[in-house]
Structures are given as structure tokens and as C-alpha cells.
Amino acid sequence: MTRFVVVVGTADTKLDELVWLKCCLLLAGVDSIIIDVSTSILGKNHQNKKSLQVAEYHPAGADPVFCGVWNKAITVMSVALTTFLNSSIDDIAGVIGIGGSGGTEMITPAMQSLPIGLPKIMVSTMASGNTSAYVRASDIAMLYTVTDLNGLNRISRSVLSNAANMMAGSVNYFTPLANIHKPTLGLTMFCVTTPGINQTNIKDYLAVVQIITCELSLIVEPKLIINKAWQQAERIF
């Protein structure tokens, strides 16, 4: 089976935008399916997976999704979408979502659950602000809509076309992660700690008896790190 891009959004409010994205992907030579995550059932027929079908992936079934309480419904649908995407992960080449505040809050947690390297683009009205809650420790690319997503216009067509072409490029020139079975060490850095975290002295860090966290290392004099004075640094703790 050919892998496809998942185009996800609420078809009850953004069907035109979803269909536009699908058409743009088709023009770029990429197969895609539309996944509806509406929390109301309006019986539209243009999407490949209707909201009821996605909602049934929730552990408690579809009923909690269509509870009529907006903030609860998007939280529950997000859980269902997460399960749905992960159950189909072998067939998915990428995920592109569109949404306002509610749609972004619903779609991005599901994206976060997907493997690093799988292309993920969120076209959102929220992308011009603090996006940390939407991205977290994932590789989601956020693209600002400029306008509200409430029907197609010359600006939204341009933004959505760019998003589709970004996804097409990511899919057509996809580079898989190297399959290296080695232990992985994660280090972080902040300002004055940067000189201590690089490839040239990483082995020295592994030799330190005590772990110096990012927060605690802020009280270590930079010269101790630069001069690799690990014993002196350890005495601070």
C-alpha cells in the first residue's frame, strides 16, 4: 500500500481548506486522505475518515466526544486522534493539520506522539504566539495562517499552498533516521554552560561523578567548565 499524508482538521468548519490542501498535495504528486475531527456530526461526505470513525478510537468509544461541551470534546477527540494515527503509523508519510485555538489544541498532542522525523506541519492561527505547549519535545513545524481559517481567500490559499508544498518536499525527499543501536545521552545548555557541552569534551562530562544539571550549572564559574576543572566544579554541590 502506498503511504499517504494525513490532512486533519474539523470538516464542519474548515472543509474548504481541507479539500484545498488535498488538491495542492495531489498537484505535487503526493497521496493524501482527509481526517475529520469535528466534534459535531453534520454528515459531510468529502472527507475520507469521518469524525465518528475517528472518535470510535477513544477507549470509551465515540459518545464522550460528542458530549456537547466544547473544551471537553476537543480533549477527548485528541485522545482518539492519537490512537488512530498511531494505529496507522506504518501507512502514514506525514501529517498536516489546520486549526484555530481549539483545532490546534486538539491536533498537536496527537502529532507529538508520532516519531521524530515523520513530517508534521500545523497550520494554525496560534502560530504567531507562544507555541511551546503545541510543540513540546517534538519536531512539529508551526505555520501561521495570517488570516482566520473561515473560508478560502487569496491569503489563506497562498498559506495553505505553501504548507502543502512544504509537506510534499518533506515526503518526496524524506531522509530516515539512521538505525544506530547505541545508548543515547541527552544534554542541554543555557548561555554560560554552552562551552561545556560540545563534541570535544563530551567524554570528560561522562567522567564526572556527579551529574550537573542545566539549572545547577548556572552557579558554576564558566572558567571551571572551559578549563575542565571538574573536581572543583563537583565541590560546589
What name fits each language-model region?
Residues 2-42, 94, 104-120, 124:
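N-terminal phosphate-binding or glycine-rich loops at protein starts, especially the Walker A/P-loop
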Residues 62, 66, 130-192:
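Cap/lid and interdomain-hinge subdomains that line or gate substrate/regulatory clefts
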Residues 45-90:
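Phosphate/nucleotide-donor binding subsite
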Residues 14-24, 33, 39-52, 180-220, ...:
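Glycine-rich phosphate/diphosphate-binding loop of Rossmann-like nucleotide-binding domains
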